[in-house]
């Protein structure tokens, strides 16, 4: 089986014999029921391949759809002229950058369809091109725009530049409304949906299908599609790991599944990571490693964001679908970028509970964050976590605490602001990472942090205090009876009292009692 990893061209997928998960019924439904659509999905989720498939369909390339749903659904196969714009290729670091990309597309079209001297701005040129294309072919035009938001995403930390891009694109995309009589179909994709003064504010005819129940499976791979198209690949994976088919499916689900694009939505697998796993035979962090969320980390640090809230707060749909660079909250960007997903929905209050979609994202994001909050070199998280886990598994709480103290040494330059919040965030990341390898429960609340960790042979009860003493922490373990539930447990139990010094921003004392 040939896996189309990184291949976004539908004709190439079909002609070269790559496996294709049939999404063409969605395309037929869109084309037959409406005209103007917008879809947001995380990067590497199949948006570009979807756009390419639409391109082939509207050009009437029936031969490419043999055996697919569209072959029988479509009766006429009318050929339409298609304008396909992809903004993913540019580097948008100056005001001229967007103009150069748009100008390249417009010049190529004007070489074919001409230009009037009065058409001096991108939007006027685009307007004239659409009209001339429609008149020349005596057929309305199909407009496909891939990664509409790439310029604004690249400028999200530069409000002035982003505003320039927004104004340019708002005028450019407004042509889709003014030239409605010449347009058959328009489809725009991107990662985000920008709020406030949106580039789409003039397009009241644009239907956002990003959270539409009918189209939640339009990108990505569902469980049914996994077992329909890739059952033999799942079996190959199972054979390589020496497990059965169900166990292999469970491993893949835990690692790559879990995306939800609406309340009570179906589970969607990350297609990029899944295909890479089938190709290599190895579980990995394929999606996460293709792009680092460095700007998102800067947002979290800038706002002194309380990290547990990433997976504990409930938010509204309007909040989720609004991204703006001014006083921006990191949560909508994390959601729309694929680092968070919908976990639950409260119908009474119409709010969403968010969480990491799967193990790949949760582990990758946590490992990536930890060096920004502790005294750790970048890319060293897996090594440190391994050492922590080995200390726990071997019954070495003193060694564990020495490593913990090192992580909090000399970190004042990394995080400014509230020292207690800094410690809570770092502690959250450490326990989150430990939880991938050991059984960990933790509580982080006002004035209190504790952790219970369990391995095959040991149980550890940690109590952390601020500007107190290790003895005070140990007394609380006894007075609150934290060890009582484990009285009959044969595993050896350690009580660990820890004090965090706010002024020095470090762990300055700990004691261990067994």
Write out the residue ranges for each language-model feature.
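Phosphate-binding site recognition
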Residues: 1-419, 434
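Structural motif
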Residues: 142, 458-460, 494
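Active-site metal-binding core of divalent-cation-utilizing nuclease and nuclease-like domains
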Residues: 133-137, 430-456
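Conserved catalytic cores of phosphodiester-cleaving nucleases, focusing on short active-site segments
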Residues: 427, 451-466, 480
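Domain-level recognition of nuclease-like catalytic cores that cleave nucleotide substrates
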Residues: 485, 489-514
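Metal-dependent nuclease catalytic cores in nucleic-acid-processing enzymes
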Residues: 172-179, 332-340, 428-432, 476-496
């Amino acid at each position: 089986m040939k896996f189309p990893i990184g291949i976004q061209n539908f004709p190439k997928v079909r002609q070269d014999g790559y496996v294709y998960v049939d999404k063409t019924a969605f395309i037929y439904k869109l084309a037959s029921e409406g005209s103007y659509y917008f879809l947001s999905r995380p990067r590497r989720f199949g948006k570009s391949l979807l756009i390419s498939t639409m391109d082939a369909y509207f050009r009437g390339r029936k031969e490419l759809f043999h055996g697919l749903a569209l072959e029988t659904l479509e009766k006429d196969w009318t050929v339409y002229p298609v304008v396909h714009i992809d903004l993913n290729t540019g580097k948008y670091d100056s005001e001229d950058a967007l103009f150069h990309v748009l100008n390249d597309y417009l010049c190529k079209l004007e070489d074919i369809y001409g230009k009037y001297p009065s058409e001096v701005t991108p939007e006027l040129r685009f307007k004239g091109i659409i009209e001339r294309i429609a008149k020349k072919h005596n057929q309305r035009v199909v407009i496909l725009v891939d990664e509409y938001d790439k310029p604004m995403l690249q400028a999200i930390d530069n409000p002035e530049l982003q505003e320039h891009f927004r104004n340019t694109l708002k005028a450019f995309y407004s042509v889709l409304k003014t030239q409605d009589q010449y347009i058959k179909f328009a489809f725009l994709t991107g990662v985000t949906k920008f709020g406030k003064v949106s580039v789409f504010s003039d397009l009241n005819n644009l239907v956002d299908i990003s959270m539409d129940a009918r189209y939640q499976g339009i990108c990505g791979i569902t469980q049914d599609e996994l077992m329909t198209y890739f059952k033999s690949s799942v079996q190959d994976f199972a054979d390589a790991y020496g497990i059965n088919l169900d166990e292999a499916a469970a491993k893949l689900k835990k690692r790559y599944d879990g995306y939800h694009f609406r309340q009570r939505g179906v589970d969607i697998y990350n297609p990029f990571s899944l295909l890479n796993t089938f190709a290599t035979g190895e579980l990995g962090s394929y999606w996460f490693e293709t792009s680092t969320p460095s700007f998102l980390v800067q947002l979290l640090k800038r706002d002194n964001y309380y990290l547990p809230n990433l997976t504990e707060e409930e938010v509204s749909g309007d909040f989720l679908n609004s991204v703006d660079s001014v006083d921006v909250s990191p949560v909508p960007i994390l959601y729309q970028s694929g680092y968070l997903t919908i976990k639950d929905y409260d119908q009474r209050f119409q709010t969403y509970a968010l969480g990491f979609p799967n193990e790949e994202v949760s582990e990758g994001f946590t490992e990536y964050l930890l060096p920004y909050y502790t005294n750790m070199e970048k890319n060293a998280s897996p090594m440190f976590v391994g050492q922590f886990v080995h200390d726990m598994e071997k019954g070495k709480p003193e060694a564990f605490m020495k490593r913990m103290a090192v992580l909090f040494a000399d970190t004042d330059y990394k995080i400014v602001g509230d020292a207690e919040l800094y410690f809570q965030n770092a502690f959250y990341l450490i326990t989150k990472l430990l939880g991938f390898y050991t059984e960990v429960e933790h509580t982080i609340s006002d004035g209190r942090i504790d952790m219970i960790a369990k391995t095959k042979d040991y149980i550890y009860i940690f109590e952390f205090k601020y500007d107190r003493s290790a003895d005070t922490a140990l007394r609380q373990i006894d007075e609150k009876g934290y060890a009582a539930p484990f009285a009959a447990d044969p595993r050896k139990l350690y009580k660990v009292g820890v004090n965090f010094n706010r002024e020095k921003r470090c762990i300055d004392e700990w004691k261990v009692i067994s």
